[in-house]
Design a protein with these regions (language model features):
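Bacterial Sec-dependent N-terminal signal peptides
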Residues: 30-46
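Primary mode marks residue(s) on the alpha4-beta5-alpha5 output face of response regulator receiver
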Residues: 41-196
Length: 196
């Protein structure tokens, strides 16, 4: 077991039993160590400037490995909403598969992202990232400051917005597709909706 995995296990404050977390992390480490030719599901070249982004991106990969196949996402109550989201000049976000139960619970848990983001490509969907989302009014009932995850602050999106939703907080994590502008920036210039 690598030092990185041991450190993640030791520092983990998640509610997952350590034995299960050890197995998940060991499997992810094996996949990552195999290199970019081992799978077409993961882009290996992510670049992070500190340990915090790398840790959160790595955790997201571990927790969402099971959702690289979109059928697993739908089986876990994630459903596509809003179609493929694209920006005029910032790239795209992709197709958001949202778990409405997780969205409505008012909680933030790195192991349970509210949305899985897929990029359409040649009639298939490729997992590229996740989005943590919490309704602002629900969050404010029990919290006095905006949400944070592994030291990363969420962005506030007011209402009205392009989605027709009440105000919410959100955090994108581009764990499966490198984003030249940063792992937590909303728009990813490497993601496109053209492959639908």
């Amino acid at each position: 077991m690598t030092t990185t995995i041991k450190t993640l296990i030791h520092k983990s404050k998640m509610s997952i039993p350590r034995l299960a977390l050890t197995g998940i992390l060991a499997g992810a480490a094996t996949l990552l160590a195999a290199g970019p030719g081992a799978t077409n599901e993961i882009e290996q070249s992510h670049d992070h400037t500190s340990a915090v982004p790398a840790r959160l991106v790595d955790l997201v990969r571990v927790y969402t490995q099971q959702f690289t196949n979109v059928n697993a996402a739908t089986a876990a109550n994630y459903q596509p909403l809003f179609g493929c989201v694209t920006g005029p000049d910032q790239g795209a976000m992709g197709v958001h598969y949202i778990n409405l139960t997780l969205y409505a619970d008012g909680l933030i848990d790195s192991s349970k992202p509210e949305a899985l983001i897929y990029e359409p490509s040649n009639g298939a969907l490729r997992l590229v990232g996740v989005e943590y989302i919490v309704d602002a009014a629900t969050w404010s009932k029990n919290n006095t400051s905006p949400p944070m995850l592994e030291g990363q602050a969420f962005q506030f999106v007011g209402s009205p917005n392009r989605y027709g939703l009440p105000a919410f907080y959100e955090l994108h994590v581009w764990a499966w597709r490198d984003n030249p502008n940063g792992a937590f920036v909303d728009w990813n210039t490497k993601v496109t909706c053209e492959g639908q």
